[in-house]
Amino acid sequence: MSVAADFSDTEQILASDLLITYTCDVRPTPEQQATLKAFLEQGGRWFALHGTNSLLDFDTTNGPIDAFGVTIPGVPYAPDLAPDYMAMLGTRFVTHPPIQEFEVTVTQPDHPLMAGIEDFTTEDEPYCCDVLGDINILLESRYSSENMSELPDGWDNPNRVHPQMYLKKVGGGEILYLMLGHSCGQFDMQPIMEQCDVVKCSWGLPVYYELLERGLSWGIAAQVPGS
């Protein structure tokens, strides 16, 4: 097993059977993207969590802004910085309104990964993502909140389906993506701010740990409980 902060150890990735990512704004170079694709095509499995599909930048047009008492360079946004990487993942993060409560619906109760899982309510970042290519949705949500009205380009449509967990085949391999899972520890925002509020979101739910365990079983043994 190897732990890394980015995708730079391409030899280790290619030598692995399972890749797990829990990242935000970690940008693979073109060479690293080619390695990730080769890893999947040779049969690798990738369990991607939360912000893996989130690459961020700041719109500095109007200069620095104050965000919750902290000065940041500008308005954060998610430009399409790595289209091939996002196409490989199957989704690209675009935006999210504030953390809020929403329902998560099981779309395929007979799928081995979903066996015995019931619809549930969570409080998390309601991710709004472009869907790129063919994905097999296992969990989905529809957001209905006044906060959504602030979002552009039709994201405020209460009937719009937002994938929360899905599978995507790439060559001989496969990606399992779980959107839920924002968290923030007391010191996670350093050096931007000294301390911040602890936020656990879906990590506080037993069903979330069940989904994680099933994802690990899927990745390690190419099977899940009950399959």
Predicted regions and their residues:
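Solvent-exposed loop/turn segments at secondary-structure junctions
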Residues: 6-8, 24-28, 46, 52-56, ...
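Catalytic beta-strand/loop cores that center a nucleophilic Ser/Cys/Thr
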Residues: 91-179
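A glycine-rich, often tryptophan-bearing local segment used as a flexible ligand/cofactor-contacting loop or short
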Residues: 26-116
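Alpha-helical scaffolding within the catalytic cores
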Residues: 3-8, 34, 160-165
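Structural recognition of the beta-strand scaffold that forms the well-ordered cores
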Residues: 2-3, 18-22, 45-49, 137-139, ...
